[in-house]
Regions:
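C-terminal helix-rich "cap/oligomerization" subdomain common to oxidoreductases
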Residues: 1-4, 37, 73-75, 300-334
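Beta-loop-alpha module in the N-terminal Rossmann-like domain of NAD(P)-dependent dehydrogenases
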Residues: 50-116
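Active-site loop of classical SDR/Rossmann-like NAD(P)-dependent oxidoreductases
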Residues: 15, 41-43, 240, 289-303, ...
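Rossmann-fold dehydrogenase core element
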Residues: 112-130, 150-154
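Contiguous beta-strand/loop segments that form the cofactor/metal-binding neighborhood of enzyme cores
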Residues: 3, 181, 187-265, 292, ...
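Predominantly a Rossmann-like dinucleotide-binding segment in NAD(P)-dependent oxidoreductases
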Residues: 130-212
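N-terminal Rossmann-like dinucleotide-binding module
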Residues: 1-53, 306
């Protein structure tokens, strides 16, 4: 019988906290939530589309949470500005960690957390939300195998139409606006396809029509690399919403086009693949690849963390990739 991991869920304020706690409720064979730390007395900006449900769990103060030493893993789900402060505490203690994103408005605090986890040999999993996406994994493996040749362009968007006026103002509380908050998910994905250091980054930061000047809810960023380009964008007033989000990757021998990026309406997630040459059982031409029916955005990633902590699989963290993703994210603040 596999060990259930004693789990501290630190924070209720992150936008993903309601979804993460809901996923953990389903994974009782892997995780035993011993406490939820209530961070709501803090004043850091935050926004929730869904309420946080701590029913059935012991809710403790932050000071009480920090006194708890007998835990196997911590989920850091505070407001964005507080993530690295809490992550550093548990990295220094050598506790396995899932920490949500983004990783702060500077590189230094995040690099310190990474260095501590490396030195102590404990897992640090960042909550970029497409890491367990089956279509993204298919693309990553196919690109690595050379199916679509050398990558020349990659683009993605995280447009949406949810959130009231307070959400629009929330985007203005971040130096990098909506794209700092959401674009890091896209950069985590696209950086797997476009390698190297950008020679130039052009960022457009604006507001949707009718919104006030303090709002940063219409943004794009164009990254130029030797031999390739990358484009990410996000607007919170795009009526197509989540079901029109897209990732497209163009190579010298083919293209991947994923739209929507994810879906939880019971329908199949489908990836369009166009090949110039036959590969591994696929003929040249256009293919619609079924990636199955998604039921949970986060479960796959955090189940993997449980297996790593128990020693069932090797640690899958690629710290150099993660540091590069954060460096690309910080370009949005310039």
């Amino acid at each position: 019988m596999k060990k259930r991991l004693k789990t501290l869920f630190y924070g209720m304020s992150h936008e993903h906290a309601p979804g993460k706690i809901a996923s953990l409720r389903k994974l009782t064979d892997d995780f035993e939530i011993v406490a939820v730390a209530d961070d709501r007395a803090r004043r850091s900006p935050t926004y929730h589309t869904d309420p946080f449900d701590a029913s059935g769990y012991r809710v403790v103060s932050e000071s009480q949470a920090r006194e708890m030493m007998d835990i196997d893993v911590v989920f850091v789900e505070t407001a964005n500005r507080d993530l690295m402060e809490i992550a550093r505490i548990y990295a220094a203690r050598g506790v396995a960690m899932h920490c949500d994103k983004p990783c702060g408005e500077e590189m230094g605090p995040y690099r310190e957390v990474v260095d501590l986890c490396r030195a102590k040999g404990v897992p640090l999993q960042i909550g970029y939300m497409y890491r367990a996406n089956p279509a993204v994994r298919f693309m990553r493996e196919a690109v690595a195998a050379g199916w679509i040749g050398d990558i020349v362009f990659a683009e993605a968007d995280m447009n949406h139409s949810y959130g009231d006026d307070s959400y629009q103002h929330y985007t203005g509380t971040m130096k990098g606006g909506i794209l700092y908050n959401l674009g890091c998910h896209l950069l985590d994905t696209l950086a797997q396809f476009v390698k190297g250091v950008p020679t130039r980054v052009t960022t457009v930061c604006g507001r949707a029509p009718g919104d006030s000047d303090d709002i940063k809810n219409r943004m794009s960023a164009f990254y130029e690399f030797p031999g390739a380009e990358m484009l990410i964008r996000s607007c919170s007033r795009a009526s197509g919403g989540v079901l029109c989000r897209r990732i497209r990757v163009d190579g010298t021998k083919g293209t991947f086009d994923l739209c929507p990026i994810e879906r939880f309406d019971g329908g199949e997630l489908k990836l369009v693949m166009t090949l110039a040459e036959p590969v591994d059982g696929f003929a040249a031409g256009r293919h619609e690849v079924s990636c199955g029916v998604q039921t949970d955005r986060y479960a796959g990633q955090i189940e993997e963390l449980a297996a790593i902590v128990r020693g069932e699989i090797r640690d899958t963290a690629d710290y150099e990739h993660d540091l590069r993703v954060h460096a690309l994210t910080l370009e949005l603040l310039k």
